[in-house]
Swiss-Prot record:
Entry superkingdom: Eukaryota
Keyword Glycoprotein: yes
Annotated InterPro entries: Fibro_Slime, PA14/GLEYA, PA14_dom, Prespore-cell_inducing_factor, S_mold_repeat
Name under which the protein is recorded: Protein psiE
Alphabetical keyword list: Glycoprotein, Secreted, Signal
Signal sequence interval, chain numbering: 1-18
GO cellular component: extracellular region
Compartments reported by the entry: Secreted
Matches recorded under SMART domains: PA14
Family statement: Belongs to the prespore-cell-inducing factor family.
Residue ranges annotated for the PA14 domain, each copy included: 114-256
Name of the encoding gene: psiE
Top-level taxonomy: Eukaryota, Amoebozoa, Evosea, Eumycetozoa, Dictyostelia
PANTHER family per UniProt: PROTEIN PSIB-RELATED, PROTEIN PSIB-RELATED-RELATED
Length: 500
């Protein structure tokens, strides 16, 4: 379908090169193999030649073109076959992570220029330009699915960039002819703008119109993409005095090292907690090999700061697992850990509070709980110490402080035990026999009443009123009815006073 033919002419004075120019020049450039399944800007259904697709000034840091717009539906992107603008950065930059969109496969390519002694220019001419057949993604036979009309396989999807420098002599011009994307920058300014999918187109640039200063050196950057089947040619004619300021360790002029170093494979240290990256492009690979110069930057924990946890990277998963920060042992303060609060930190509670017989939240100097004293219990129960009470604490069943009378009752029911509230001294009082309750009950003989001895023994006695203390009467009591009688004594019937 497409013919790729790029004709770039860099004219140098014949007098300079006629005697000193070598027969061939080799220039190593960067190539990025693309696969439509990974970047659908390749093998799009639509597209034609378009200018103004990219910015007119080259990014001085990345040194790759940038789209004017990242909107997919604008006319220029549609006409240029850019259906997914977000993947355009990977036309000319490495993206070797298969888990991300836009994956490509960086390679290096040697362009061999032949010196034309008649015209005094160097020429690279390839009318069947498929330099990475069976390379990159196409190492896998399953990726070799794009054929021309003759059912011939080629790798039709790749981009190439050439970053170099030249010293301006004041008379150089160049011409080129090409199809698909071809962009050329001189001094970071776009001088050739042929983007999109198109048949070969030619143009010319007069360097004398670019405002360059003779003797100064300027960047020369060429970007070329093949994005569609079925043909590819390239022809470069150059006699500009270009040179390479440095080569990366892959041998590519001003390369990025990606053509021979993949951070995911070359630099893989099998540690998920490091970010593996290739050496910087200008690294000099001395003793050893490229992996010896790789960088393995520890991953940074992005979890919010938590005073209860340290986050430690898991070398198997690459995740930052929370590791609890041990709380201080405060057992010497009678404190035990109950957990950690992400705002205030470790939380403690007194081990003394679980025992009702300990003073709450109080710890001795030797790290033991302080038990409640009798005075403590007196104050707790009565507000003050009652000297007639004995205070103690019972931890069984969570009872806590208890009290009992200091002066215990006597076993003799006729003794009353009492306590002096002022000094707490115990003393006893004898209870009268008729008041004391020694268990006599009501006597069967109704002429008697209950009576307790001082020892508390029941000894009922006759009612006192039976004896009227009159010697001239005979006192009697009916034991069944309790009726008391006082009959005059016989000897007292004839006189007023009884005689013996």
């Amino acid at each position: 379908m497409k013919l790729i033919s790029v004709l770039i002419t860099f004219l140098l004075a014949t007098v300079i090169y006629s005697q000193t120019s070598p027969a061939t020049l080799k220039f190593t450039v960067q190539v990025y193999d693309q696969f439509p399944g990974f970047n659908n800007n390749f093998e799009p259904g639509l597209g034609n030649a378009i200018t103004g697709l990219i910015k007119s000034t080259l990014n001085s840091t990345s040194r790759v073109p940038e789209l004017v717009s990242t909107e997919a539906r604008i006319v220029k992107n549609i006409n240029g076959g850019i259906i997914n603008p977000s993947l355009f950065p990977y036309f000319f930059s490495p993206q070797q992570d298969s888990s991300l969109p836009g994956q490509n496969s960086p390679l290096s390519l040697d362009l061999i220029f032949t010196y034309d002694t008649t015209r005094k220019i160097y020429v690279y001419d390839n009318q069947n330009f498929f330099p990475i057949d069976n390379q990159g993604f196409d190492v896998d036979p399953a990726k070799r699915i794009y054929l021309n009309e003759k059912k011939t396989y080629h790798n039709y999807h790749f981009c190439m960039k050439m970053n170099t420098v030249f010293t301006y002599k004041g008379y150089e011009v160049f011409n080129f002819r090409g199809d698909d994307d071809v962009w050329v920058f001189i001094n970071n300014k776009l001088v050739i703008d042929l983007g999109g999918l198109h048949s070969p187109i030619g143009t010319s640039v007069d360097t004398m119109t670019l405002g360059l200063t003779i003797g100064n050196s300027y960047n020369f950057d060429l970007f070329f993409c093949e994005r569609h089947t079925v043909g590819s040619t390239i022809k470069i004619e150059t006699n500009l005095l270009f040179y390479c300021p440095f080569k990366d360790y892959c041998g590519v002029c001003q390369g990025d090292g990606s053509s021979c170093c993949n951070p995911l494979t070359t630099c893989n240290d099998n540690n998920q907690c490091t970010i593996d990256s290739c050496p910087s492009a200008n690294t000099i690979i001395g003793p050893g090999s490229i992996p010896n110069y790789c960088f393995h930057t520890p991953k940074i924990n992005t979890n919010p700061i938590d005073i209860c946890f340290n986050y430690q990277c898991n070398s198997s998963t690459g995740n930052f697992d929370p590791i609890p920060i041990p709380c201080l042992d405060r057992s010497s303060e009678c404190l035990s850990t109950i957990g950690c609060n992400s705002t205030v930190g470790c939380q403690y509670e007194s081990i003394c509070n679980s025992n009702v017989c300990n003073i709450q939240n109080q710890c001795s100097s030797n790290g033991t709980c302080v038990p409640k004293s009798s005075n403590d219990c007196g104050i707790e129960l009565d507000g003050q110490v009652d000297k007639c009470k004995i205070y103690s604490c019972d931890s069984n069943g969570g009872v806590g402080c208890i009290k009992e009378d200091k002066c215990k009752p006597s076993s003799n029911p006729c003794i009353s035990t009492q306590c002096n509230a002022t000094n707490g001294q115990c003393y006893e009082t004898q209870i009268p026999g008729d008041i004391c309750d020694c268990g006599c009950g009501i006597p069967e003989n109704k002429c008697k009443v209950s009576w307790c001895t001082p020892e508390g023994i029941c000894q009922p006695k006759f009612k006192s009123e039976i004896d009227d203390n009159n010697s001239c009467t005979l006192d009697s009591c009916d034991p069944c009815t309790g009726i008391i009688s006082h009959m005059t004594a016989p000897q007292c019937l004839s006189c007023n006073q009884c005689s013996n």
